[in-house]
Amino acid sequence: MTSEQALLVLGIETTCDETAAAVVERRADGSGRLLSNIVRSQTDEHAPFGGVVPEIAARAHVDVLDGIIAAAMNEAGVAFASLSGVAAAAGPGLIGGVIVGLTTAKAIALVHGTPLIAVNHLEAHALTPRLTDAVEFPYCLFLASGGHTQIVAVLGVGNYVRLGTTVDDAIGEAFDKIAKMLGLPYPGGPQVERAAEAGDPNRFAFPRPMLGRQDANFSLSGLKTAVRNEAGKLTPLDPQDINDLCAGFQAAVLESVADRLGAGLRLFKERFGPPKALVAAGGAAANQAIRRMLREVAAKVQTTLIVPPPSLCTDNGAMIAWAGAERLALGLTDTMDTAPRARWLLDANATAPAKFANTRAGF
């Protein structure tokens, strides 16, 4: 399979709490077209528990995935026999869900004699801007989601260098934990963002983690503890207390992330020259305050900011299909014995920063 022909790829995403499928076309010139994108969120199933329950997530994927795939194929007007490839997120993620999606993709590929592409979920986020904006390599990726916060040099398909990572909580995870701590509904990230809009960001003097460091790593656990301590002093919390705590927390995150991105962009330029763009991906990139901060960071270093539409920042099948198409165009396919992976580094050579070997930064 070469890039000199158009490719139609079905993508399947089941790594967490969205069941999704999509069909994309990758044209011979490398441009892309989204033919369908069906996403079914499991928010209602997990809301009573205040977070994602892996067993419930896996069972929900089993219940609806066939219908989601059928809807995606129908909307695209594509028959299975016309597909150039079938792509599925093979990790990282909740292993039960990953198994559901990857096994389904294998079955489709076997029945129709279609190539299988096992996609790294993080690579799919990294390559999405090439579908939406045709961005050229190399670019600097800020990946911010519930499970990951990284700064990555995207040098080509399958060629990634991690410049910075969180040593504890991911940004989306921290937002969700703050929401739960303050009694806000699940999913917590949008609730914190909404409350922050009505709050005073200057009422509380929260720390700005990792500010001024030469590396490009993140840390949010200390900030989370500071919010918990202030909330404990005010219990019971009234609505304005909650708004102000959220505003102060979000302001601290924004300042810290802006500083860390500045360091990451400096490291990128030192190693690879100026990036073609600063790209943001992952669910946290749907936060409008984060988007405003990203525009300021990009303007400061005189680079272009590219952020996919919110529906393509959160988990979706289109990003899996597109990553599959990009890999298929290079002749990269996978065998039927490809294993699902709970952990899967985007940069296979990444190592934990000094003093953080036993933290999340080691993954």
From Swiss-Prot:
NCBIfam families: gcp_kae1 (TIGR00329), T6A_TsaD_YgjD (TIGR03723). Transmembrane segments: none annotated. Pfam families: TsaD. Required for the formation of a threonylcarbamoyl group on adenosine at position 37 (t(6)A37) in tRNAs that read codons beginning with adenine. Is involved in the transfer of the threonylcarbamoyl moiety of threonylcarbamoyl-AMP (TC-AMP) to the N6 group of A37, together with TsaE and TsaB. TsaD likely plays a direct catalytic role in this reaction. It comes from Rhodopseudomonas palustris (strain TIE-1). Substrate binds at L143, A144, S145, G146, G147, D176, G189, N287. GO terms for cellular component: cytoplasm. Fe cation binds at H121, H125, D315. Its cofactor is Fe(2+). This is tRNA N6-adenosine threonylcarbamoyltransferase.
